[in-house]
Amino acid sequence: MSLIEDILQTSSTVTLLGTVLFLLVLYLRSSGSSSEEQGKEPPGPRPLPLLGNMLQLDLKKPYCTLCELSKKYGSIFTVHFGPKKVVVLAGYKTVKQALVNQAEDFGDRDITPVFYDFNQGHGILFANGDSWKEMRRFALTNLRDFGMGKKGSEEKILEEIPYLIEVFEKHEGKAFDTTQSVLYAVSNIISAIVYGSRFEYTDPLFTGMADRAKESIHLTGSASIQMYNMFPWLGPWINNLTRLKKNIADMKMEVIELVRGLKETLNPHMCRGFVDSFLVRKQTLEESGHMDSFYHDDNLVFSVGNLFSAGTDTTGTTLRWGLLLMTKYPHIQDQVQEEISRVIGSRQTLVEDRKNLPYTDAVIHETQRLANIVPMSVPHTTSRDVTFQGYFIKKGTSVIPLLTSVLQDDSEWESPNTFNPSHFLDEQGGFVKRDAFMAFSAGRRVCLGEGLARMELFLFFTSLLQRFRFSPPPGVTEDDLDLTPLLGFTLNPSPHQLCAVSRV
């Protein structure tokens, strides 16, 4: 299907032409007032009126185009997504300087049209200002209280592992697609933390929420939604936007129903999860006369939606990449399983075992680096006028920290384009942290759930490798396994099947 067919359901030539002409006039008028008198802007390819650099961008994998442009224009450059000016930051040193050393300058979120459709400015991921600060602070505090990065989360993951293993065992070594089972296992961890309980993998409410969250993240990265972000007036003709909005509406109704059930059984002295804690805080503020606080229903619903979506797709996708890479490179799988057998034996792996499994830890980190699942991060904006590396960037300018250029920076990684666990090992085989490992981004917008994600990846990965030998389906060789990502907002493995043969 062509991009135009993907975007347009119907068209009114007169309406579209009139709108294009109107926007062209606005563009020409606005382009006359540049910031040249304030300072030199980052270089970049010359944009066309209205279209910007669209003809130079591959909207199906824009991160690849941006990496190529960085070779020509340097580590900071300007590109126009349609009429919208965007500054791209490339390479470890530049991204770190912006996100870490000048965190306040580059710390705001760019609320694109589709992100606004998601949250209307509420919640944790796609918000700015005092509301975002309060919601993020509250989320961090309470997620720690309910186990993020601590013993509580470990117990929840250890409870979930047997359910996932049971699903794998039911296939009896025959080829199957790991997508849904891994998605549901990971989704249950955040469900237990947010709602206070896990769901059965056959629960239609749960599977619907998990499947819709994954589909929505995939659609967000589609070429048609990127076109919508550039030209919001195209919205009525974009199929994927219609599907996204339906998913968002369904998600909101499902969260409202789950919250209603929790509210009916709420015990302020025994909070079961994030939702309970939020409801108690909201009730306390209202009883003290604070009726205009940030603790309102919209912030609750969208914060829960953010935590559920962000806490499932990225971790589940990374785990699936790990299993695929183990199947693709059996000699590396051999070394992981030898280390697990030698150090752990047949007992359950625990988080405290990580320090004694340096090779396995290196493999997990290298999986995250090479999988590069959020290549363009989530866009930022400048919170004020900024002078950065000699260039002037106006307040409110969209900024893309190109994470793929950090995770594959050839000045930081010895073999950036190959799967090489030695990137995280010293000469004695000990684990080595690498500063350029920014799989969770950095600065004010660093991933809220980094600690939880690291724990999930370690415990799920080691438990599965301890229990199963992963191999290609009959008739398929390791060389046949395709590592080309399925394009979307996150980079998923292409559709594939694996065989999980019991080692027990």
From Swiss-Prot:
Where in or outside the cell it occurs: the entry states: Endoplasmic reticulum membrane; Microsome membrane
- Induction or repression: Constitutively expressed.
Identify the cofactor(s).
Answer: heme
| Resulting phenotype, residue 261 to S | In allele CYP2K1v2
Q: Where does heme bind?
A: 447
Tell me the GO molecular function terms: heme binding; iron ion binding; oxidoreductase activity, acting on paired donors, with incorporation or reduction of molecular oxygen, reduced flavin or flavoprotein as one donor, and incorporation of one atom of oxygen
A cellular component term from Gene Ontology for this protein is: endoplasmic reticulum membrane
User: Which membrane topology term applies here?
Assistant: Peripheral membrane protein
Record's CDD domains? CYP2K
Keywords of this entry: Endoplasmic reticulum, Heme, Iron, Membrane, Metal-binding, Microsome, Monooxygenase, Oxidoreductase
Q: Which reaction does it catalyse?
A: an organic molecule + reduced [NADPH--hemoprotein reductase] + O2 = an alcohol + oxidized [NADPH--hemoprotein reductase] + H2O + H(+)
- What is the recorded phenotype of mutating residue 372 to D? In allele CYP2K1v2
Its GO biological process annotations read: aflatoxin metabolic process; lauric acid metabolic process; lipid hydroxylation; xenobiotic metabolic process
Q: Which Pfam families does the record cross-reference, listed alphabetically?
A: p450
Question: Chief subcellular site?
Answer: endoplasmic reticulum
EC nos = 1.14.14.1
Q: Which family does it belong to?
A: Belongs to the cytochrome P450 family.
Q: What is this protein called?
A: Cytochrome P450 2K1
Native species:
Oncorhynchus mykiss
